[in-house]
Amino acid sequence: MTVTVKMLVDKLKLKVIYGNEKLLSKPITTADISRPGLEMTGYFDFYSPERIQLVGMKEWSYLKTLTDHNRYSVFSNMFKEETPAVIVARGLDIPEEMYRAAKENGVAVLQGRNGTSSLSGDMSWYLNAQLAERTSVHGVLVDIYGMGVLIQGDSGIGKSETGLELVKRGHRLVADDRVDVYAKDEETLWGEPAEILHHLLEIRGVGIIDVMSLYGASAVRNSSQVQLAIYLENFEDGKVFDRLGNGNEEIELQGVKIPRVRIPVKTGRNVSVVIEAAAMNYRAKQMGFDATKTFEERLTNLISKNGED
């Protein structure tokens, strides 16, 4: 996904001190952010001009100790054609030399009201999410009790219908049919809808419905962490399914492993309720409450007791 300076300005509510439409359309190619401390002393080895340059109180205070000529020299060396923008945090005044060098080198000058650490954290979170590599998977992503559940299965098994039933039960739709997933870090997987499919759900026999229009803003989410995968498959006699819940099946997406539960589908079975139970059971396990383990302990104790008798 392409992220521009204008998108960052809108997301973080930054003030544009200098920058025309062309400069605000510059792409940001990396989520890494530069705090140009050593660069202000004239040391530019290993400098990364393609990063957003963030000036905080420490850098700003040091700049005040320099002469006008040296301040201008620092910014002239710092600002390159590939530099997306420079951001001054805490609403600090923009040095005249910074403004002049930015104008000469075609770099947008922005100002943020938040503290440097807060601004840096918000930028990193946003840029990492937007610039992460994405993979599209077939399925329905629903937020169930605050936990992202990816529902997959064969075509025609009833994934979208199950998603609709879950929405009617108070849960929130994230994506239907195509789910774009990306890793924010090595252990966290997120999913979002394709741009053209936002808030839309396809139901065979009915067509495409707008979930937000029918059920309100509380029935949808723009993105969600993916924590559990559900695979729906037709129930067949003789086919073995996990009955104790001690299976450890996982799927891997974008290098992140998430647990998967297989649920058999047959006429008369309320699949949405079963998925709710699977989601709550997974959350309970994360909190240390494992019903399977409790059952196994009770069974072991009962066998031991009967053996003694």
UniProtKB/Swiss-Prot annotation:
Residue ranges, annotated region (Important for the catalytic mechanism of dephosphorylation): 264-269
Keyword Flavoprotein: no
Keywords assigned: Allosteric enzyme, ATP-binding, Carbohydrate metabolism, Kinase, Magnesium, Metal-binding, Multifunctional enzyme, Nucleotide-binding, Serine/threonine-protein kinase, Transferase
Activity vs pH: Optimum pH is 7.5. Active from pH 5.5 to 9.5. At pH 5.5, exhibits less than 15% of its optimal activity.
EC assignment: 2.7.11.-, 2.7.4.-
Cofactor(s) it depends on: Mg(2+)
Top EC class for this record: transferase
Entry binding sites for Mg(2+): 160, 202
Activity control: Kinase activity is slightly activated by fructose 1,6-bisphosphate (FBP) at low ATP concentrations, and is inhibited by inorganic phosphate (Pi). Moreover, FBP, phosphoenolpyruvate and 2-phosphoglycerate, but not fructose 1-P, fructose 6-P, and ribulose 1,5-bisphosphate protect kinase activity against inhibition by Pi. Dephosphorylation of P-Ser-HPr by S.salivarius HPrK/P is strictly dependent on the presence of Pi, and is inhibited by FBP. FBP seems to modulate HPrK/P activities by enhancing affinity of the active site for ATP and, conversely, lowering the affinity for Pi.
Binding site for ATP: 153-160
Domain free text: The Walker A ATP-binding motif also binds Pi and PPi.
Family that this chain belongs to: Belongs to the HPrK/P family.
The protein, known as: HPr kinase/phosphorylase
